[in-house]
A protein has these predicted regions:
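Sec/Tat signal peptide C-region and signal peptidase I cleavage site
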Residues: 31-34
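Bacterial N-terminal signal peptides
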Residues: 19-29
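N-terminal secretory signal peptides that target proteins for export/translocation
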Residues: 1-15
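Carbohydrate-active catalytic/glycan-binding domains of CAZyme proteins
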Residues: 3, 36-570, 605, 647-651
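Lectin-like carbohydrate-binding module/patch detector with strong preference for beta-trefoil
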Residues: 567-704
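Residues marking helix boundaries in flexible regions
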Residues: 26-27, 57, 571, 577
Length: 704
């Protein structure tokens, strides 16, 4: 399909923009039938070979907190202004998760929670929860700005959950039920504060609020509070560039406290994407283009740790993964001198993109956390759905027209203020959404359709005027619309989102078979106005002052062409040639050492030998294996005869954008080619955001 030039105000080199658009043209598949979208798999981190890929979820799951109860793991996270809130996910292997409940269905604390009286809670609502289990009861504590600390509790994580409020607000808190029966919460940023909660969790113990860890020790925000083998640990993240994760440790709450960095500079090869300048909420927006420099790498931050029954420890954290939102990753934890470092023994502080699954004692089927598609035939919405703010439950229905979601329009000046917009997290790295809309029940002034909720946002909608129907695409970046005439109010609407390029394209169809693009490419940007990633949304509102008609949606299908971290099979038993992505140099064996040589045609054919769990050895034609000696310094990557061991074994790491890394089991670091032709090393800590640091390779099959 011919792509139109993107229309938006942008500052930055034009070459980068052209590259981004060219990548989209190459990457974009065009699905032309609705039937092709049914039954497609959704993102799952499990690679099916004993390994997993980060992120665990390729959709927004921010401020995660995790607990283990027996052999079961539970996870919750921030939901801000969306309802229901505080999702509860369950797993038995830390990789395959499934949503089982929300802690609450609605949180209505005033007109701003309902998008009434010109007020909203975008970027607010409920956030940064602390998940705990104590004496048979599950607890979730979470702050709401201006409304204090919310406490939810249940005997069963599937609910029902009860709720009470503590008037004082404790932002970014973490709760510890201590061995002496006291209940403590740490909170705040920089200077970490601690306060004791009363026994029934209805208030704070007077006189107990104080600074626990002074700002001078360099702690951050988003604390996670633990007591492990008699010692107290607090894990936090430093806000700003590179956001390292810090850990404070003490033998007693009174101190003294020590602090070390346990995770730093791990971006998983992801750099900063599009960003709106300032906090403008009206067009035209000024959008800065991607900046893949190391100084703006998007590092893992804000998370905690959990122990498995086998004694392994694992870390969880989030990453500002551009417009798709803040994503959760899983990290092996290595204890050194009583400190829980994220990463492997030879590469402390750095999380592998692909690694072997945790030893939890359970082998689970490959599972996605949500059923994203919905045919609206059931008595309830799929659990993936969340309303934008508190809905008016009298203005939507699954029963008025069985098999359809019916949205009755309410007055709103624009989509931002439209009540009863039904949303779900957009999913990466790439997805297409299709819905069938019957707009015969719309009234003049109604507009109903499919949107990308973000700031700026965009939508494709059917409009009812005094003289009939039209279809319109609105791009808030520019504030411009593109219109087309339609002969029927029965349409199929689609949006394709590529979160690698951060470009979306809307299209529509009169028959559900052939789709026509409408409008230019829409730039999806990461922003802090909503403090969430992009969300798909179904909506219906009236541009007048009174309620209008109704819109009926027949289905909502999500298609993900790249639902696995291993984007293509490892070429086991095939010979490949490797080329450095940075400069096009080939890898070749010269004088018994692996070297980078100019000219792709000079590369050595290396046979990929399966070593299990996604690990491989690289065999030369004469039966020798690429081997890492010593610390993997330049010149220590050679070829050796004999049966391959750890020195000859590499984790095959697919970075999901066509490039591959090789993680040495001997050094826990990556093979890296020098900038100029020369000997190769295996001492690189991890990929740079621009993928041009010599650790990223492309491979092709070659004759043996």
């Amino acid at each position: 399909m011919t792509r139109r030039r993107t229309r938006f105000t942008v500052k930055g080199p034009r070459q980068l923009l052209r590259f981004t658009m060219l990548a989209l043209i190459i990457a974009l598949p065009m699905v032309t039938t609705e039937a092709a979208q049914r039954g497609n798999p959704s993102w799952a981190a499990d690679n099916g070979n004993g390994t997993y890929s980060n992120p665990i979820f390729y959709d927004e799951f921010s401020d995660p907190d995790m607990i283990r109860v027996g052999e079961d793991y539970y996870l919750t996270g921030t939901t801000m202004h969306t309802m229901p809130g505080l999702p509860i996910l369950h797993s038995r292997d830390l990789v395959n998760w499934r949503i089982i409940a929300y802690a609450f269905d609605r949180l209505d604390l005033g007109p701003d929670f309902r998008l009434e009286e010109g007020k909203n809670i975008y970027g607010g609502g409920i956030w940064a929860p602390s998940f705990r289990y104590h004496n048979g009861t599950f607890y979730i504590f979470a702050n709401v700005n201006r409304f204090g600390l919310q406490v939810y509790r249940s005997k069963d994580p599937r609910g029902p959950w009860t709720h009470n409020r503590i008037e004082q607000g404790l932002h970014d808190l973490s709760v510890l039920f201590d061995d002496d029966g006291k209940i403590y919460a740490v909170y705040a940023s920089g200077a970490i504060r601690m306060v004791e909660l009363n026994q029934d969790l209805t208030g704070l113990v007077p006189g107990t609020d104080h600074v626990l860890i002074d700002r001078s020790l360099g702690m951050g925000e988003g604390s996670h509070f633990y007591k492990i083998k008699g010692k107290y640990y607090i894990v936090s993240a430093i806000p700003g560039a590179h956001v390292p994760m810090k850990c404070a440790r003490a033998d007693a709450l009174a101190g003294s406290w020590e602090v070390k960095t346990i995770s730093q500079e791990e971006s998983l090869g992801i750099g900063q994407g599009y960003r709106p300048q300032g906090r403008r909420q009206a067009p035209p927006f000024v959008i800065s283009p991607p900046d893949l420099s190391e100084r703006l790498s998007l590092d893992l931050h804000q998370g905690g740790i959990v122990e498995t029954p086998s004694g392994e420890w694992w870390g969880f954290s989030m990453q500002d993964h551009n417009s798709v939102g803040r994503l959760t990753s899983l990290s092996p934890v290595t204890w050194v001198d009583g400190w829980p470092y994220f990463g492997l023994p030879g590469n402390l502080g750095r999380t592998p993109s692909i690694w072997e699954k945790p030893n939890t004692g359970h082998v689970e089927p490959i599972t996605s956390p949500y059923d994203r598609s919905d045919d609206f035939s059931g008595p309830k919405l799929q659990m993936v759905w969340q309303w934008n703010h508190v809905p008016d439950d009298t203005k939507w229905s699954l029963s008025e027209r069985p098999g359809y979601l019916r949205l009755h329009s309410l007055p709103a000046k624009d989509f931002w203020w439209a009540r009863n917009s039904l949303t779900q997290r957009a999913v990466g790295p790439e997805s297409s959404v299709t819905t069938e809309l019957d707009g015969a029940g719309l009234k003049p002034g109604d507009v109903a359709g499919l949107a990308l909720l973000n700031s700026p946002y965009a939508w494709l909608g059917l409009m009812r005027g005094d003289n009939g129907y039209g279809i319109e695409e609105y791009d808030q970046v520019t504030g411009k619309t593109v219109n087309a005439l339609v002969s029927s109010p029965h349409l199929w609407l689609r949006v394709h989102c590529n979160f690698d390029t951060e470009i979306a394209q809307f299209s529509y169809s009169p028959d559900g078979k052939t789709y026509k693009p409408l409008g230019a490419d829409f730039v999806m940007a990461f922003q802090l106005t909503t403090f969430q990633g992009v969300r798909y949304a179904l909506f219906n509102y009236n541009t007048g002052a009174a309620p209008g008609g109704q819109a009926d949606f027949n289905f909502f299908n999500v298609d993900e062409p790249r639902p696995r971290g291993l984007t293509k099979p490892i070429p086991v038993a095939r010979s490949i040639a490797l080329t450095d992505l940075a400069n096009g140099n080939a890898l070749a064996v010269v004088d018994g050492k692996l070297q980078s040589v100019s000219g792709a045609e000079k590369g050595t054919a290396l046979r990929v030998v399966d070593r299990g769990k996604g690990r491989i050895a690289l065999e030369t034609r004469d039966g020798k294996y690429v081997s890492v000696g010593g610390e993997g310094k330049p010149g220590e990557v050679t070829v050796k005869s004999g049966k391959p061991g750890d020195a000859e074994t590499f984790q095959w790491v697919d970075l999901q954008r066509g490039d591959t890394l090789f993680l040495s089991l001997a050094t826990h670091r990556y093979i890296v080619a020098p900038k100029d032709p020369g000997v190769v090393a295996a001492d690189h800590p991890g990929p740079a955001p621009d993928r041009k640091d010599g650790s990223c390779f492309v491979w092709k099959s070659v004759p043996r």
